[in-house]
């Protein structure tokens, strides 16, 4: 799969831009702050319905504009599709596929798949658990787009349950009066049902990614491993099937109910879990060097690419200013590993930041213009 044409209107710094794209490597080169990342960010948005840089859509709309539009032509084998997303901050976004407006934004998931390498990837190893949960859930959705609905259901139920718990906590603090918590039982069931499906997918994903990540780390840093991925659930237990995970979550919610009412927040569930990344016998966070942490983060992304490619729809590889963060050895090894990709999009401040093995199409980016060299 590859993108053959990218069109942006009022997206980030671009009033309007048209970028023809070929299979193989394409590099966008120009000084920082000129809009290189905006181009690959738009491609990533088509794949995830979100940005790797900001948490809301508002910053994606050019200042003074009401909406932004991302449009892309995508080819998979002999099949071509036209995807369009209209970003409307404060209102519902809109989507079109092959000019049909009878689709929801979520329906475009799976048409474009990307694996993004970016400076922010270091947070996968050194950052908070939320970074690792996001890594798992975005990859789950790339494998199975319907999981976007499950994630949305879980977030909605979690919000409703937290509202009820917060009200109960406030009522208890003010005068000692109690609330009818019978509806909490219903929310527990909804939360456990969606949570169990999400957990089952996460556990299956980790089992698939583990050997691929270990192989990728060995390719990047020979003799430096092994690496191991270990899921750390907030609801204790060894369950793996969806049914057993449901029972495990229900038991954990019952056990935590008194404390949750006191604190006014849900304390167990996938939103509180973590992924432990081990290097050798030690956790990478806190023990791995800066270089080892980079190798680990890159290995996770390479494993994601290998997994999606093996499942039949090769993703677009996006390397956003990542080579400038790496030493010469890691830079060359990463370039050699991604070069065979069907489509590789690279951004760099200067030509020298793009390894020679990634020779291909070049665009210069400056002052809102994108020109092919």
Curated annotation (Swiss-Prot):
Record family assignment: Belongs to the RecF family.
Protein name listed in UniProt: DNA replication and repair protein RecF
HAMAP family assigned to the protein according to its UniProt record, in alphabetical order: RecF
Taxonomic source organism: Streptomyces coelicolor (strain ATCC BAA-471 / A3(2) / M145)
UniProt record, GO biological process: DNA replication; DNA synthesis involved in DNA repair; double-strand break repair; SOS response
Function: The RecF protein is involved in DNA metabolism; it is required for DNA replication and normal SOS inducibility. RecF binds preferentially to single-stranded, linear DNA. It also seems to bind ATP.
One protein family per Pfam: SMC_N
Gene name tied to this protein: recF
MF terms (GO), sorted A to Z: ATP binding; single-stranded DNA binding
InterPro entries: DNA-binding_RecF (IPR001238), DNA-binding_RecF_CS (IPR018078), P-loop_NTPase (IPR027417), RecF/RecN/SMC_N (IPR003395), RecF_2 (IPR042174)
Main location: cytoplasm
Subcellular location as annotated: Cytoplasm
Cellular compartments per GO CC: cytoplasm
């Amino acid at each position: 799969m590859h993108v053959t044409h990218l069109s942006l209107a009022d997206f980030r710094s671009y009033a309007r831009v048209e970028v023809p794209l070929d299979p193989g490597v394409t590099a966008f080169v120009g000084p920082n702050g000129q809009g290189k990342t905006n181009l690959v960010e738009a491609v990533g948005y088509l794949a995830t319905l979100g940005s790797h840089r900001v948490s809301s859509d508002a910053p994606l709309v050019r200042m003074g504009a009401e909406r932004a539009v991302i449009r892309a032509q995508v080819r998979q084998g002999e099949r071509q599709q036209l995807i369009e997303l209209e970003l409307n901050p404060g209102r519902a976004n809109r989507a079109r596929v092959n000019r049909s407006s009878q689709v929801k934004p979520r329906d475009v998931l799976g048409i474009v798949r990307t694996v993004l390498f970016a400076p922010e990837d270091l947070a996968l190893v050194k950052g908070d658990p939320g970074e690792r949960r996001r890594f798992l859930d975005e990859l789950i959705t790339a494998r199975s787009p319907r999981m976007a609905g499950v994630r949305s259901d879980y977030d909605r139920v979690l919000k409703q349950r937290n509202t009820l718990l917060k009200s109960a906590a406030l009522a208890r603090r003010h005068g000692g009066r109690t609330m009818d918590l019978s509806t909490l039982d219903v929310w527990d069931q909804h939360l456990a049902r969606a949570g169990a499906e999400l957990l089952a997918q996460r556990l299956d994903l980790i089992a698939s990614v583990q050997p691929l990540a270990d192989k990728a780390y060995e390719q990047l840093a020979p003799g430096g491993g092994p690496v191991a991925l270990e899921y750390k659930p907030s609801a204790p237990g060894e369950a793996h099937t969806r049914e057993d995970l449901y029972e495990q979550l229900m038991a954990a919610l019952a056990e935590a109910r008194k404390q949750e009412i006191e604190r006014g927040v849900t304390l167990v569930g996938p939103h509180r879990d973590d992924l432990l990344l081990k290097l050798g016998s030690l956790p990478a966070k806190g023990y791995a060097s800066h270089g080892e942490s980079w190798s680990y983060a890159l290995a996770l992304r390479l494993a994601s690419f290998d997994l999606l490619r093996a499942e039949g729809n090769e993703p677009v590889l996006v390397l956003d200013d990542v080579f400038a963060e790496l030493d010469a050895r890691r830079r060359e090894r990463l370039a050699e590993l991604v070069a065979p990709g069907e489509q590789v999009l690279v951004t760099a401040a200067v030509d020298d930041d793009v390894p020679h093995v990634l020779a291909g199409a070049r665009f210069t980016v400056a002052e809102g213009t994108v020109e092919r060299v």
